Amino acid sequence: MRSKIHECVGSNKNEIGKKLIAGCFVIGIAFNANAQDYWKKNAGKTGKVILTHSKANEKMADKGSVKFEKFGQPKETEACIFVDPDFKYQKLIGIGGAITDASAETFYKLPKNKQKEIIEAYYGKNGIGYTIVRTNMNSCDFSSDSYTYVADNDTSLKSFSVAHDEKYKIPMIKEAQKAIGNNFTFYFSPWSPPAWMKSNKSMLKGGRLENQYYQTWADYYIKFIKEYEKRGINVWGLTVQNEPMATQTWESCIYTAEEEGEFLKNNLGPTLWKNGYKDKKVMIWDHNRDLIYQRATTTLSDPETSKYAAGIGYHWYETWNNKTQLFDNLSETQRAFPDKFLAFTEGCKEQFDMSKIYDVSLGELYGRNMINDFNKGTALWTDWNVLLDETGGPNHVGNFCFAPIIADTKTGEVHYTYEYYYVGHVSKYIKPNAQRIGTSSNRAALIATSFMNENGQLVTVIMNESDQDIETNLWIEGMAAKLQAPAHSIQTVIL
């Protein structure tokens, strides 16, 4: 019998007797006062079930409600998802995706009614609840060409202009902002400084930011923020550099952990603060899970650097040299830096093939990553392009990829992949500021995560990636509801 409730750093409650252990506050509260009392407050509650099941062609289908009945000690032979609302962890900042040049250009090639449909599908009241928008500062691979916002060799940055973005990107971002409302959360990432600031004199294929341009480049971020905010787009945050360890055929720039730290400590951080942008959330790393712990522990080892960083961003592409995703590196990093939030800043399925856009494996890739990322402490989750065309682009270096929504710009047809529905099982029902609560499974084939929304709704997402149908039980403090988890399905249960 427990006599303590564990609650992670970041709780707004004013408890007494806090003691910091392993990055979490252990709060001394009597068992009979607050522990194991979910059903005392929620007697008779049923669970609404939403299911996506590829074999039955069901997509976010309402399956009715399930009742909870007394269920004592589960046996090892009984499949269960265990949820304990007493154990509370990180709060959700939000879920969303990137509005890149490619997404925006594709968007404005579509008929007006399709544009409206896509905005509603992601950001509207009947959509899947996206609140996060990421974009690129300067060009990236998902641009139609390379570009910057200044004339060559303009160290004064007097020529700075975001006119390029006003044609497609800014209008689409503002459409999303209008639909989202107050929860709109926008951040940006640079892929490369202008070529003349770099060691290789190219925006492509890596290279480094030359030392003499560190401050000029820091000032560039300020210009970008001011121009976007002048247009009514409030900037919530930024990453220092997209994928700082990748020498790509597209826009890229290399920083070691020490170099990123020096740039943040001596240039970017002070420049943001000096210009009144202390509230902007700076995220370091913004690359794969494989090196996240090493980068964080190195870059943030200096308190004078760490004070400028609010979060640690990461991508999912470590499988290029690993068989599986390295989720455990996230929890290790979170334990090391309980005062920094973890942010998934990019992921997509590469090697686009139009004939495979309805494969359920696309959705399962997203479900597997989202559930594990949240269970390891992630507070913000951002997909890559929200929209791409029938080629998986446009992309000026031929790096064509999948997206949750694919639009055929020749016919005007809009395709919703399983990526869209699997993400929606999380993003539509788990709201910003929801708090993750304790969840585990006694079957490897079933993975799950749970959050408590601010209105008291308890939301559990369960995925079965196996080839077998599984009957399971959603078990909460001695009460359980029977659920069917069909092969290759995902479901959301809302209490």
Describe the residue ranges of each PLM region.
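Active-site neighborhood of glycoside hydrolase catalytic domains
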Residues: 216-234, 244-350
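Conserved, mostly hydrophobic/aromatic
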Residues: 97, 129, 186, 238, ...
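Bacterial Sec-dependent N-terminal signal peptides
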Residues: 1-40
